[in-house]
Amino acid sequence: MAFLALGINHKTASVDVRERVAFTPEQLVDALQQLCRLTSSREAAILSTCNRSELYIEQDHLSADAVLQWLADYHRLSLDELRASAYVHEEHEAVKHMMRVASGLDSLVLGEPQILGQMKSAYAVAREAGTVGPLLGRLFQATFSAAKQVRTDTAIGENPVSVAFAAVSLAKQIFADLGRSQALLIGAGETITLVARHLHEQGVRRIVVANRTLERASILAEQFGAHAVLLADIPQELANSDIVISSTASQLPILGKGAVESALKQRRHKPIFMVDIAVPRDIETEVGELDDVYLYTVDDLHDVVAENLKSRQGAAQAAEELVSVGAEDFMLRLRELAAVDVLRAYRQQSERLRDEELQKALRLLANGGNPEDVLAQLARGLTNKLLHAPSVQLKKLSAEGRLDALAMAQELFALNEGSTDKSPQ
């Protein structure tokens, strides 16, 4: 086996380079087939996300330079430019790297779960392209198992490490069933987009996006089946909102105490969960003084994120140990599998010799031969034939002074000095 894992990621390459080395979903099947054809790779898979583009390859002989040249040519980059950002892992280190990636240990956000799904998609596309064989098939399954064990046996994925996810996690603590809740999101930037995605994934009943311009609110709302309104419509929406999360660039507060008091009266003081992620603040601090309002600021969330990141870093050490064990186990099984073909051929050869001697013995018995003599001849003949080829090779190795091979043969046949018969002196 000659196995390679190579590519670029957020730690080694700028966004500009990552964009140029990324593969679109439509390119992948053709790229995989071309990669195998032009680089003498027997098996290949490509993982391409916003933070990394990696190639997993099995070859007869390691040829990282040829693969890097292909990658540079495919994306019309200079080889020197690509080489400056690329990393190459071989054999055991390549297996370990692949398992670390799938477990979220190499991610921009430590322990993020999306990468495992992306790895599974890479495997599915490679199977579709016909570039997955015995090695990658086994390796992907071992990788998925290792990542699952990391998720199950460590706390690396349990605590949110983004402000958006932390906000949604706090909402889940207050509302046991988000599927019965309505959310009002104020703003339409990157953070609110992440909040909308997390809420949508949690099955929130209804999402309303309020923004200064209806066009931007509508673009975001369409992604998650939400409803778009203007900032001026917030008072009407507030009374129906169980969750309010705001993140705008406004220099003045958007929500005041009076508007929230009015909404609470209409809600008959049913609680409202509010998160103000904006700096400067979108929600007046006095709103937090109201009964039935749970108001959190960006600083509150940063404390949660920092504590959770510390927890994840502690869990990462245990996860690294699990990945190391998983990689070692895979390499051990792979080395054991390497003997399967040899053992199969040796068994077939032995069975052929056995059948030849057995047929000879049956003919002798049919012609009236003495059974004891026939059995003795069968045993001698089979022993001689089984030992013939090894004997010839051992004599040849001895004549060549290959003492290492002789020692290996002694170990192979479980021989030692005390096990051989010695003639009387």
From Swiss-Prot:
PROSITE patterns associated with the record: GLUTR
Record pathway: Porphyrin-containing compound metabolism; protoporphyrin-IX biosynthesis; 5-aminolevulinate from L-glutamyl-tRNA(Glu): step 1/2
Gene Ontology MF term list: glutamyl-tRNA reductase activity; NADP binding
Enzyme Commission (EC) number: 1.2.1.70
Residues annotated as binding substrate: 49-52, 107, 112-114, 118
Residues annotated as binding NADP(+): 187-192
Leftover remarks: During catalysis, the active site Cys acts as a nucleophile attacking the alpha-carbonyl group of tRNA-bound glutamate with the formation of a thioester intermediate between enzyme and glutamate, and the concomitant release of tRNA(Glu). The thioester intermediate is finally reduced by direct hydride transfer from NADPH, to form the product GSA.
Free-text comment about domains: Possesses an unusual extended V-shaped dimeric structure with each monomer consisting of three distinct domains arranged along a curved 'spinal' alpha-helix. The N-terminal catalytic domain specifically recognizes the glutamate moiety of the substrate. The second domain is the NADPH-binding domain, and the third C-terminal domain is responsible for dimerization.
Subunit structure: Homodimer.
Protein known as: Glutamyl-tRNA reductase
Organism: Pseudomonas putida (strain ATCC 700007 / DSM 6899 / JCM 31910 / BCRC 17059 / LMG 24140 / F1)
